[in-house]
A protein has these predicted regions:
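Bacterial Sec-dependent N-terminal signal peptides
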Residues: 1-29
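Residue-level signal for short segments within beta-strands and strand-turn junctions
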Residues: 77, 93, 156-158
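A generic local structural motif
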Residues: 30-32, 93-96
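Core segments of cupin and vicinal oxygen chelate
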Residues: 35-39, 45-90, 124, 142
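Vicinal oxygen chelate
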Residues: 20-49, 68-70, 96-160
Length: 160
């Protein structure tokens, strides 16, 4: 009888330990997923022969309100309509070095949360980080290289 009680106790303790361990792992996984969240597209940048002419064409034919940097599309966040967001559209001169080391004629900017933690996670996963995080009044930026050699810009917008 003592052996059966001991076996039941060991099995129960093992089950509860496994359950507790699984709960801890699941919570850590949720934090990792939260850390890696891309919240949207922050910008689309592309090379062209004449950025000024390109801006004028889009202004004339598609109604873009352009500046020397292209245009900025404003929108509201679905989860919190009180919060504004924006997506930048910018033509660059075909001679720009800004997209290097990528040889592509475009670069996409992704809006992210918690950039510092995301960069650490990406480093641990072996992703190439091109530069250090830079901070400006409108947010923090860093560049990475994806699996096909495309330079990607990650942007954590400044808190409003």
């Amino acid at each position: 009888m003592k052996k059966i009680s001991l076996i039941i106790l060991v099995i129960t303790a093992s089950f509860l330990s496994g359950f507790a361990f699984n709960t801890i792992i699941t919570e850590q996984s949720k934090k990792t997923i939260k850390m890696k969240k891309v919240t949207g597209i922050g910008g689309i940048f592309f090379k062209c022969k004449d950025p000024k002419k390109m801006n004028e064409w889009y202004k004339t034919h598609l109604g873009f309100e352009t500046s020397q940097y292209g245009t900025n599309f404003e929108w509201r966040e679905a989860a919190d309509p009180a919060k504004k967001g924006s997506t930048q559209w910018s033509p660059f001169a075909e001679t720009t070095k800004y997209f290097e080391p990528s040889a592509k004629d475009f670069m996409i900017n992704y809006r992210v949360e918690n950039l510092e933690a995301l960069v650490e996670q990406l480093k641990n996963e072996g992703v190439t980080i091109v530069d250090k995080i830079e901070s400006f009044d409108y947010g923090k930026f860093v560049h990475i290289i994806d699996v096909e050699g495309n330079k990607i810009e990650l942007w954590e917008p400044a808190a409003e």
